[in-house]
Design a protein with these regions (language model features):
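Hydrophobic/aromatic beta-strand patches that form the interior of the parallel beta-sheet core
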Residues: 18-20, 135, 162, 188
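Short internal beta-strands
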Residues: 1-3, 23, 137-138, 157-166
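C-terminal helical cap/extension that packs against the catalytic core
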Residues: 148-208
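Phosphate-binding loop of NTP-binding sites
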Residues: 1-3, 7-16, 76, 199-202
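Nucleotide phosphate-binding/pyrophosphate-handling subdomain across enzymes
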Residues: 53-159, 173
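Extended acidic/charged loop-beta regions that coordinate divalent cations
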Residues: 9-55, 96-99, 103
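A short helix-to-beta-strand connector/capping loop
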Residues: 7, 15-18, 107-109, 157, ...
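Short, charged/polar "capping" segments at the starts of alpha-helices
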Residues: 5-10, 27-30, 144-146, 168-173
Length: 212
């Protein structure tokens, strides 16, 4: 169970067998599980704390993916899979298609496909995964979702945003309702994805990340 997620952690009283947990912070003395400290992933089992691997060995972007690795490692520990096997698997895993998938580097900019992020919360997690200047492509089908929180993050964190598809008008409205930030330089509206990609290519500079 995730120690740092209230919905998950509230289920601990329902556990019939051995409880293992994961989270960014070290577990309490009476708990076993994985955690992150000083750039390293650890597994605590009783009085033993074992180093799994350094954070820099994880190829996946974003803190949410660190949580995913911590969860995978604690499941592996429950199955008594050796630490060296955990380490090897994580180091070789570069992600799945359409989920913060690195597409290519082009003229010094890096292009990522996160098109599986069809909800604003997932798009926000993707934005938080990068420190580089961002060009963000937002759009697709209109699922009547709330865009306000993402719009606020875009103004704070994104350099250029390009909207397209059915949901473009709602995204534009949400962006217009937010107090402008200092980071966002431009907002463009394109009819379709291909046009949006072309617009992003014109804006891209070396060191930028283009995120769909």
């Amino acid at each position: 169970l995730n120690r740092e997620d209230p919905g998950s952690w509230n289920l601990r009283s329902e556990v019939k067998g051995r409880l293992l947990s994961f989270g960014m912070q070290p577990p309490a003395s009476d708990l076993d599980g994985t955690f992150c400290q000083n750039g390293q992933l650890y597994l605590k089992l009783g009085s033993n704390t074992l180093a799994i691997m350094p954070l820099e060995s994880i190829k996946l972007r974003g803190e949410h993916n660190i949580h995913n690795v911590l969860a995978a490692c604690v499941i592996a520990a429950a199955l008594e899979i050796p630490l060296e096997v955990m380490r090897s698997c994580v180091e070789r895993f570069s992600g799945v298609p359409h989920r913060l998938e690195f597409v290519r580097e082009w003229r010094g900019s890096q292009w990522y496909n996160d098109s599986i992020a069809t909800a604003p919360e997932r798009a926000m997690a993707a934005v938080h995964s990068f420190q580089e200047p961002l060009i963000l492509l937002l759009g697709g089908r209109d699922k009547n979702l709330p865009w306000q929180d993402l719009a606020e993050l875009v103004h704070r964190r994104v350099k250029h945003v390009i909207v397209f598809g059915e949901s473009a008008s709602k995204i534009l409205a949400a962006l217009g309702d937010v107090q402008p930030g200092e980071t966002l330089q431009s907002i463009q509206h394109c009819g379709a994805l291909q046009e949006a990609v072309q617009a992003a290519a014109k804006l891209a500079r070396g060191g930028d990340v283009i995120l769909l």
